[in-house]
């Protein structure tokens, strides 16, 4: 798996992820790019789960964004509907965190769309709970920027989770 975390603070949203690709107990690659910009750089997206499945979902989500003029929630709900009803999509094993300047969402592998708690922190993947806990503690107890919180949360997850490394890709809006 992996770790993807998103923090929204002081007018910025940051999504970051590690670069480890594992096959069973073997590390296959350490520098995968699991966080990307979509829709002309206006949407951030990060994935956890099967790499090929995630790229399929990135493509489908970007099509939904184009179809709905970049409306994040509408695009996510439409993707989730397709994910639940299409036989081929139902077999995809991945989760996405998506964010624009206004909102952040998780799109789950069973076709659910989840909005964050009031703290605007989201995390997915095998190290997601570690990163989420770290990010919440840092938001509540420091004045760090959203980017610094994402970096530190990923570092903590990478130190604890064997399926997460410390080779990070981090994107932020506004840029």
From Swiss-Prot:
Q: Name one Pfam family in it.
A: Proteasome
Judging by the UniProt lineage, the source's domain of life is Bacteria
Reactions mediated catalytically: ATP-dependent cleavage of peptide bonds with broad specificity
Where, subcellularly, is it found?
Cytoplasm
- Residue ranges annotated as coiled coil are none
GO BP annotations, alphabetical order: proteolysis involved in protein catabolic process
Q: Which Gene3D superfamilies match?
A: Glutamine Phosphoribosylpyrophosphate, subunit 1, domain 1 (3.60.20.10)
Documented EC number(s): 3.4.25.2
The known regulators of its activity are described as: Allosterically activated by HslU binding.
Membrane-spanning parts: none
Print the keywords alphabetically: Allosteric enzyme, Cytoplasm, Hydrolase, Metal-binding, Protease, Sodium, Threonine protease
Where does it primarily localize? cytoplasm
Query: Is Protease tagged as a keyword?
Result: yes
Query: Which InterPro entries did the record assign?
Result: ATP-dep_Prtase_HsIV_su (IPR022281), Ntn_hydrolases_N (IPR029055), Proteasome_sua/b (IPR001353), Proteasome_suB-type (IPR023333)
Where does the chain bind Na(+)?
158, 161, 164
GO molecular function per UniProt: metal ion binding; threonine-type endopeptidase activity
Q: What class of enzyme is it?
A: hydrolase
Active site as annotated: 2
Q: Describe the family membership recorded for this protein in Swiss-Prot or TrEMBL.
A: Belongs to the peptidase T1B family. HslV subfamily.
How does this protein assemble? A double ring-shaped homohexamer of HslV is capped on each side by a ring-shaped HslU homohexamer. The assembly of the HslU/HslV complex is dependent on binding of ATP.
Q: What is the protein's name according to its record?
A: ATP-dependent protease subunit HslV
Give the species this sequence originates from.
Haemophilus influenzae (strain 86-028NP)
